[in-house]
Amino acid sequence: MKAGRGTLGVCLAKQSQGGDPDKLACGLKKRSQKRNPSPSVVPSWTDQPVADSHGKSRATGAAASEMKHGQSKASLLHHGGFKVLQSLKGSVGRSSAPAASLGKAVALSPAPSEEQLAGMSHGIGDALGSDWPGREPRATDNRGQYLKGESWVSGRPGHPKLREVGFLRGEPPSAGPKGLGTWSELSHRYFELGQLPYAYPYYKVLPEGELRCVSLDRFNPGLSEETVEDEKTLKFFRWSADSRGVTGSAIFQISKSLMP
């Protein structure tokens, strides 16, 4: 610069004083090439930058803004899952948390892992097992499973509905099934069924001459008949449990004498 004027201003001044326009243009081109790098080296997005009021290139500012926005999105994707899980955990931990906040946390959270699902199922099962209205807490082992032999009706001792259908509190009799898929004939009509979950709301009492049975919620009864010595009909009831605390299936055999 000379006297505060740029190269273009100097050339125009010389031309006005009678200088050769071709020589002035050639000199202007050479000076521009010395000050600026080769066009092949300069990226295309920097061609013809427009200076803003602060003297910065708008293209450079746009590139920096885009890079910052990309970093923010990457940070959100990386840490967003952890923050949402923490929010969900806090909402579940507070019994007075609004349902709306929990719904938002669930809607924003990614798909839970198998361990998280197992933990949620375990917590729900414990709550239902111990806080059921009107029941006594049942004993569990160190893994939260109900102890073998713990009666499902222990929280309802002597309930009239259980007595009416013939189910008593306690373990199955010695003549009952010993293992999964095995059975033996029961000589008496009334027997103890210790692993029956809350049958009294679904009881059904038949006439005295008929078999007494119970319709259980969440159970799929399957009935098969077999004639033995033309005197007795054996009916086998198979229940496959899908609720917590009942493992596998139990087959119980109820016998009824057809003799008068």
Curated annotation (Swiss-Prot):
GO cellular component: acrosomal vesicle; cytoplasm; nucleus
Tissue: Expressed at high levels in the testis where it is detected within elongated spermatids during the late stages (steps 9-16) of haploid germ cell development and in the tubular lumen (at protein level).
UniProt keyword annotation of Translocase present: no
Domain of life per record: Eukaryota
Principal location class: nucleus
Keywords: Cytoplasm, Cytoplasmic vesicle, Nucleus
Region named Disordered: 1-75, 129-158
S-adenosyl-L-methionine found in the keyword field: no
Gene Ontology molecular-function annotations: STAT family protein binding
Function, in words: Promotes dephosphorylation of transcriptional activator STAT3 by interacting with both STAT3 and protein phosphatase PTPN2. This promotes interaction of PTPN2 with STAT3 and mediates STAT3 dephosphorylation by PTPN2, leading to negative regulation of STAT3 transcriptional activator activity. May be required for spermiogenesis or sperm function.
Protein's recorded name: Protein FAM220A
Gene: Fam220a
